[in-house]
Structures are given as C-alpha cells and as structure tokens.
Amino acid sequence: PEGPRLSRLMGAQVLCSPMNWNESSIPSDIWLTRAKENGMYVIASNRHGNEKGFDFCGGSGIIDPEGRVVACQPHGDGIAIAEIDLEMKPDRSDIPLRRPKLYRELQLQRYPWYQSQYYQAYATEPLLEGKQFSTAVYSIKPENREEGFMAVKQAISQAGKQGDRLLVLPELVLGGVPDDLQQAQCMAIREDDPVWKELSSLVMENHVDVILGFVLEENGKLWNAAACLCEDGSRHYYQKSHLTEREARWAEAGDCAGLVLDRPYGRIGVLLGNEIFITEVPRLLANRGCDILAIPAVENPSCPPGIP
C-alpha cells in the first residue's frame, strides 16, 4: 500500500498499474481498496492467458476514487474504456484522518532482522512460540444492548463448543451504532460494569479469547472501544485512535495506534473498523511482531462491494 499512498501524497490523481495478476477475483479487491483509501483513480491493466504454467486472469479495469468499477474487461482480450473526472471530490467522511505523531515508530525498521532473533534478543516483550489454532468471526446486528448481550453470549458458547481459541465479534456490538452524543451516552458501558464480569466468566468457561466492540465511558468521556476478554481472566481495552466524521460527533480519539496483546498461540494486533484504511496502523502492528490482526468492524454502506 505504500506505493499508491506516496503517489497520492505527491499529488497524483490517477494510478496507472500494469499487472501480472493471477488472483481469481477481478477486478481485484486490492485494487478497489487502494482506490478508496487514497481517493484516486486506479487504472489496472492485467495480462490474460497462460504462460509457462501461470494463468493470468485478465480483468483489466478502471476504478474511481470511491472504489467503484466504472469499466472492466472481465475475461479474455479486450479494452476497457471510461471517461474519468479529475474534478470529482470523493466522499472521505468514512475515512479517518491520519495522526502522524502516532507513527514515529515506523522509522524503526525491524524487517532486516529475522523476526524470532530480533524479538528474543532485543525486544522488551519477546515473542512467544506460535501455535496452530482455530479462530472464529461472527456477524451480528443487534437492535439494542440486551439483544447484543445475548448474541455475544451465544457466540462465545458456540466458539467454545467448536474448540476455537479466538473469537472476534463486530464493532459496537454491545449497544449498537450511535448517530450522536445523546445516543452514545445511552449506549455507553464503563470498565467496572457487571457485564464484563459475566462475560469474562463465560470466556474462561469456554477457553476462548474474545474481542468485541462497544461504547466506553470513563470520567465523563466516551470512546469507540474494543474489549479483549482473555481465557486467563485478564481484560484489556483499546480506544479507537482514528475516527470518522460520524464517530467524532460523540467519541474521543485514543492515544495509541492499535493494541498489542500476547496470547499463548501468538501476538494479536487490535484495530477497529475503518482504521484498516490507515495503512500506517497495520504496518505499525506488524513492526511490533503481531501475527494476527483482529479488527471488529461494523457494516459500512458507503463502501462498494469488494472493499473490506
């Protein structure tokens, strides 16, 4: 993602990409995401046919700054043609603003080192040996806090029966998605709320770690937050640091770009929703040695199909 991002920072409005792509989905979801997250046209010209045992899928296309396909040659040889409007002002309300002060750690490039050697020898928190494990995600759209609470408990019990070690539930699953400050205040849950004790007991009983989203209240302030409930009884909270325009109506921004959580099966990086569009944040978590990105998210009706 750094190439398109740098091109956009230098003022490019159109990204022209000759491709050797053999992914089955065409146009690729990756192309759509690069267009959406950077607010620029992507013109991707891909090869078609077989060469030396490789099947190139074709699917050349033109994608607008909203991530919508405006022209595509889905199969075989051919040309995709479209008019593009460089005066188009894409809707950026669902893309959080960047916070460069949180990304200073990106200058510490650890990739020249073998990951295991670096983190065992120099890191303040050495990596644990990774393990193969089962994880689960659930799509839940509750209408209120009570309904969401029951759905979460059912999901935890089901994950436990399946032998899953990690369960990731949606953003704001406890309470719902607020439109304004007043709604958020009604949905808010404190860290000392009895709901966490009950859910933690269920988590320990089912031997599964659970990550879910909710509105956090603390000292009269509200955050879009994630709760990480671990099977050892510990609880961890992440306050979303990159807010959309809608979220900024009611939420404070957190002070950390992502949360790092060590578990016996690997190191987890936690983000929330549209923060995945801010490419610096998952890169930071990768630099910190995360094996897994857990991203509770809520449906975004403004995103075209194919964009995460």
State each model region's role.
Residues 10-11, 38, 65, 206:
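Short, structured coil segments at secondary-structure junctions
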Residues 1-13, 18-29, 33, 56, ...:
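Active-site catalytic loop in hydrolytic enzyme cores
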Residues 10-12, 131, 161-165, 208, ...:
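Short, high-confidence coil segments that cap the C-terminus of an alpha-helix
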Residues 21-40, 145, 149-240, 246, ...:
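Cys-nucleophile CN-hydrolase/nitrilase-fold catalytic domain and related Cys-dependent amidase chemistry
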Residues 124-146:
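Short beta-strand segments enriched in small/hydrophobic residues
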Residues 40-41, 47-132:
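C-terminal beta-strand edge segments of enzyme domains
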Residues 16, 41-43, 136-138, 168, ...:
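Hydrophobic/aromatic beta-strand patches that form the interior of the parallel beta-sheet core
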Residues 44, 60-62, 80-82, 212-214, ...:
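Short beta-strand scaffold segments in enzyme catalytic cores
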